[in-house]
Amino acid sequence: MVLALEGLNVCPTTVRNVWIKENLETKYKRLLRLEAQVFKDGLELTVEQIKLLEKANPEFAERHVESNYPGYLLCQDTFYVGRLKGVGRLYLQAVVDTYGSYAFAKLYTSKRQETAADILNDMVLPHYQAHDINIEAILTDNGTEYRGRPMIHLYEIFLELNDIEHRTTRVATPRTNGFVERFTRTILDEFFRTAFRKKLYESVDALQADLDEWLKNYNTERPHRGYRNQGRSPIETFEMGKIRRNEMLKEAA
């Protein structure tokens, strides 16, 4: 449109060939390139561009969220997977580190405070303890599995015992947890839909085993092109963040 106003006509095929040459043949790739320019060059966006980026990548909506290093702020959410024959309803507890998108995921047959705490105890804390990192804060919505009466609610007690600050999203605005929203969208598209087409699962354990394999690839092999990772895998960003964390803690000492 702009070129036409200037009296220039460009063949759509020419535009397409340029996109292919620059690895920008899809709208998603073009948005990723735009996102990278924002953080690399300080590019100012129009309102429409911001809306498109936030729709393509919910994490972008959280671009002003401070996350200085691994463990600084994690996000947790419950995702309804569906029904498994002979088992019933399946729920996924998902936890994502906002510094680099390192993620954890575990399946349950219920949506309760016990399961919300279990993934932290079983998967999340052991990982950070192995790296000698403290989890400083976790962000959740206001679901009953996460919020309740102090000193009675199991999840709240678990966080208190482990000296983890509990932050919550604004009431009636569940989309303010963009990091975990992006992860659950990815796990639905790249794992669950494919897994259920290829295989008939008869137990939660069987599905969890395949999920663990997918998650290993997600964290260690899959490049993340979002603004925080810039093409690195979550574990690569995590390891780089450990160095940054140590430097920041030394400066603060």
Located regions from the model:
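Short, intrinsically disordered/low-complexity patches at protein termini
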Residues: 23-24, 33-40, 49-51, 99, ...
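Residue-level marker of positions within ordered structural domains that often coincide
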Residues: 4, 20, 106, 192, ...
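C-terminal domain-tail junction helix/linker
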Residues: 50-51, 58, 63, 162-164, ...
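RNase H-like DDE/DDD metal-dependent nuclease/strand-transfer catalytic core used by mobile genetic elements
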Residues: 9, 72-92, 98-212, 216-217
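Intrinsically disordered, low-complexity segments enriched in polar/charged small residues
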Residues: 21, 32-38, 69, 111, ...
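Basic, flexible linker segments flanking DNA-binding modules
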Residues: 1-72, 144, 152-159, 231-243
